[in-house]
């Protein structure tokens, strides 16, 4: 059984899952829900108001961000939450599908890497036009997502 595991793929699955599980599910969904259910026990930075203050405050540092992005927060934040959860859901599907095994096609892992690239690109766009410091790590993660896509495609011989 252990000889059939594709050890070159498992770290990629673990990293993508851990990154998006923490940034999408734990930080956003659990933080916002905890802020609704028990506002006195929730960390204020992870509640809806906390995220709004942080994100809109970052966007408001630039005139472009203030004019174009800040008014859309209440509409865009739920979309961001869903987008940030998509890569880790696709990784779960990849693991359930057994894509960590050798000689196995990895479509769900590929979809997870593409969704990671898309989500990170959207986030980097908003942070870059706002001049936010968060854009630096996002640009690095865009690079990681692109390398992951190339690695998966190369590993499958495509």
Q: What residue spans do the PLM features occupy?
A:
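Active-site-adjacent helix/loop patches that line small-molecule binding or acyl-intermediate pockets
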Residues: 85
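Membrane-interface interhelical connector segments
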Residues: 32-71
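Extended, low-polarity transmembrane helix blocks
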Residues: 1-27, 74-78, 89-158
């Amino acid at each position: 059984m252990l000889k059939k595991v594709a050890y070159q793929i498992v770290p990629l699955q673990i990293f993508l899952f851990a990154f998006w599980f923490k940034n999408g599910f734990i930080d956003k969904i659990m933080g916002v829900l905890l802020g609704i259910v028990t506002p006195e026990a929730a960390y204020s930075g992870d509640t809806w108001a906390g995220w709004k203050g942080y994100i809109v405050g970052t966007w408001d540092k630039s005139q472009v961000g203030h004019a174009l992005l800040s008014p859309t927060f209440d509409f865009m934040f739920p979309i961001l939450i869903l987008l940030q959860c998509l890569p880790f859901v696709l990784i779960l599907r990849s693991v359930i599908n057994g894509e960590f095994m050798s000689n196995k096609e990895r479509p769900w892992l590929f979809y997870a890497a593409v969704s990671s690239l898309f989500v990170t690109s959207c986030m980097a766009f908003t942070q870059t036009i706002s001049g936010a410091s968060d854009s630096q790590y996002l640009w690095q993660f865009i690079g990681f997502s692109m390398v992951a896509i190339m690695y998966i495609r190369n590993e499958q011989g495509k």
